Amino acid sequence: MKIVLAGGSGFLGSALSRALRRDGQDVTVLTRSPAPTTTSDPRLSFVPWTPDGTVGTWASAVNGADIVVNLAGESIAASRWSAAQKDKLRESRILATRSLTSAIRQAARPPAAFVSGSAVGYYGDRGDETLTETSPPGTDFLAELAKD
């Protein structure tokens, strides 16, 4: 399978990339960093992208992919949550998702699946309450960020 992974250099993305490649999948990581020109793993490639809400040349990686996984976004733990940092967290997730969904809509051969991660923060801190997928969202910043 050909899998495109946005956010593939982050905490979850790098672990997912390793696991997928161990299972024999080909992984293309969309990266904001300068893309390495070579890699020791033939199942791994890098494509530079700018997740700014638009579609760029990177979208050719999406065309013909089997699955696109979106784990992109500014690190929650990178710094204190000032108003500016909260805006950066929100914008990085919304624009990355907008870029990917636009590329998928424009693809001649769109992927069969699009998986976009949010977070357990969706439920908020409920103490000892047992939560299920049908539990309502929380009301704190992380819950609002996941809903956005």
Residue ranges, per PLM feature:
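Short beta-strand element of Class I
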Residues: 27
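Conserved Rossmann-fold NAD(P)-dependent oxidoreductase catalytic core, especially the SDR/UDP-sugar
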Residues: 86-88, 98-140
